[in-house]
């Protein structure tokens, strides 16, 4: 039950995390490679984003295609994690929305900026990850730009690889009601 709640809230965090920055800081060292303002009215841009399908891992075993888990509002993509009281043919106790750019948008260098608002809740696991396009995890590695658990006031940044599983680990303590 605890894992279930954690996953549901993680997906909710993904919703909040996917609201990209409206402005960027100019840098001579890095080139901003993409901007997503989520300025569509009814849905996210399906030429770039895909709803994450349900899987068997802790992070995706409650993913759902149901519209009740997704919303566009004031230039923000809102991903929700909800208790499943309405989808009788779906046995998952919780449903969550999540999106990724897999197979549609590839980054090979540059700077990535993300503005996100995270809601703290029991079972929450909001995350912004960079995953390999072709190699399976963990062989292709993973960069956790941000992960936050439950009511933690810490945003974790981690890199994983095939050789060391966790290469580096840092964290940032967040002020209450902060934006990441």
Regions found by a protein language model. Name each.
Residues 171-180:
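Single conserved hydrophobic/aromatic residue that forms the stacking wall/gate
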Residues 23-172:
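GH16 jelly-roll
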Residues 1-27:
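Bacterial Sec-dependent N-terminal signal peptides
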């Amino acid at each position: 039950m605890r894992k279930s709640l954690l996953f549901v809230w993680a997906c909710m965090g993904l919703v909040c995390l996917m609201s990209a920055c409206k402005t960027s800081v100019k840098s001579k060292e890095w080139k901003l490679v993409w901007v997503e303002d989520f300025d569509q009215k009814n849905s996210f841009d399906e030429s770039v984003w895909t709803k994450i399908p349900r899987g068997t891992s802790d992070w995706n075993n409650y993913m759902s295609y149901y519209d009740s888990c997704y919303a566009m509002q004031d230039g923000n993509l809102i991903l929700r994690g909800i208790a499943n009281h309405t989808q009788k043919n779906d046995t998952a106790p919780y449903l969550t929305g999540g999106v990724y750019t897999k197979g549609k948008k590839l980054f090979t260098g540059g700077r990535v900026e993300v503005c996100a608002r995270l809601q703290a809740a029991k079972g929450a696991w909001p995350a912004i990850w960079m995953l390999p396009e072709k190699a399976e995890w963990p062989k292709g590695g993973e960069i956790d730009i941000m992960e936050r658990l439950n009511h933690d006031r810490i945003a974790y940044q981690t890199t994983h690889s095939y050789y060391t599983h966790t290469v580096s680990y840092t964290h940032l303590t967040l002020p209450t009601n902060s934006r990441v």
